[in-house]
Amino acid sequence: LEIIPSEDCLPELVEFMKEFAARRLGKGVVIAKDTPNFIANRIGTYAYMQVLKKMPEYGFAVNQIDRITGQVIGRPRSATFRTLDMVGLDTFVYVANNAGQAVEDEKENADFQIPAWLQKMVAKGQLGDKNGQGFYKRVKTEKGSSSLIWDPVAEEYVPPGQEALP
């Protein structure tokens, strides 16, 4: 739980809320400054940005990344790219830009720079679940429907392969 005390907030109230959240709600508490984005968003955005930048470099496919960043490491089944599709690619870009602007260090700021291929996706209207095309896209087939995945190098949707993980 993130608690953001204002200048006018009584220290006793902050302490009470910390204690209440920890004991009654079972929550870990972080005292934060009043800055844009939640702490978890800033940390999560950084982690997602690292994946987005490394994926094409190492030749991973969207579905491969989701297989290794989901339940196998204790994260939700939606993993990385299904989560980004749920959030909305335009929303993620907004949050990442916002987080990057709050960072003063040049190298850290570079970590929040949106990859060109993701900027193109958003510019083309690929927003994720909002409009049915993000990193995943459902298509109708003769046998019903199937999913395609976005290939950032080819800049097109492709069938997901069942490649072995390295």
Go through the PLM ranges and name each one.
Residues 1-166:
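N-terminal glycine-rich phosphate-binding loop for ADP-containing cofactors
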